[in-house]
Amino acid sequence: MVMSQGTYTFLTCFAGFWLIWGLIVLLCCFCSFLRRRLKRRQEERLREQNLRALELEPLELEGSLAGSPPGLAPPPPPHRSRLEAPVHAHSHVHVHPLLHHGPAPPHAHPHPHHHALPHPPPPHLAVPPRPWSYPRQAESDMSKPPCYEEAVLMAEPPPPYSEVLTDTRGLYRKIVTPFLSRRDSAEKQEQPPPSYKPLFLDRGYTSALHLPSAPRPAAPCPALCLQAERSRRVFPSWTDSELSSREPLEHGAWRLPVSIPLFGRTTAV
């Protein structure tokens, strides 16, 4: 069977289309592979930099003790103090003030490079302090809340963040807090208790319903008016004691004696 020219052209186009599509897919897969590999290398490089920074952090802390606050002085090296301790003990030979009549002679220093050593720091300052344990007095901006390490090491917990936001002076309101609490409690005591009386007690049943406007009817008869006034006097409130102490209910065909407040939609048809 011989293929016609049209069939040959169709098969050639079909094969070429799928071949080009396959090459595009392979190219996309290769690009994604390269991107993932570059991203992995970048993450490894960042991880190595972080590890190096963590390893060099103690050295930086030891070097930064020279610029620490005045109360925190770096301790002297221990080997130097051990070597110079006996020399320092022999050099200080004092004469009794009653036996000495004249200017005090200078102390003889047997070692030419000897000089006075500073006083050793207290034992609680011998350990190099952490950077977050420095006092915050040197900082200019006190409106920022403390970091997590400072909040953990603080003797008193920091004020809530709402107080920091409402503070207009830029300082924590630790001193003003008790006065504010007293003033708020006084204001709460001065406020009258809320009244729980129901609404629309002296109005009709349809006063809470928004009905379309209609032509006003004629004036009712005086008997109905007297009955309405009497029902208003009989049921002034919702309390059971007043309901039991009043006269019995006289049913009226045109309105309810006690108005019930209605809000929203009703089920009336």
From Swiss-Prot:
Residues 2-39 are annotated as: Required for membrane localization. Residues 108-117 have a biased composition (Basic residues). InterPro entries: WW_domain-binding. Residues 146-269 are annotated as: Required for apoptosis induction. Disruption phenotype: No visible phenotype. Mice are viable and fertile. T-cell and B-cell development are normal. T cell receptor signaling and activation induced cell death appear normal. Small reduction of CD4 single positive thymocytes. This is Proline-rich protein 7. The gene is Prr7. The chain crosses the membrane at residues 10-30. Forms a complex with NMDA receptor zeta subunit GRIN1 and epsilon subunit GRIN2B. Interacts with GRIN2B. Interacts with GRIN1; the interaction is reduced upon NMDA receptor activity. Found in a postsynaptic membrane complex with DLG4 and GRIN1. Interacts with DLG4 (via PDZ3 domain and to lesser degree via PDZ2 domain). Interacts with JUN. Found in a complex with JUN and FBXW7. Interacts with JUN and FBXW7; the interaction inhibits ubiquitination-mediated JUN degradation promoting its phosphorylation and transcriptional activity. Interacts with SRC. Coiled coil: none annotated. Residues 146-166 are annotated as: Required for internalization. Acts as a synapse-to-nucleus messenger to promote NMDA receptor-mediated excitotoxicity in neurons in a JUN-dependent manner. Inhibits ubiquitination-mediated degradation and promotes phosphorylation and transcriptional activity of transcription factor JUN. Might play a redundant role in the regulation of T cell receptor signaling. Might promote apoptosis in T cells. Highly expressed in brain, moderately expressed in lymph nodes and T cells and low expression in thymus and spleen. Expressed in single positive progenitor thymocytes, particularly in CD8 single positive thymocytes.
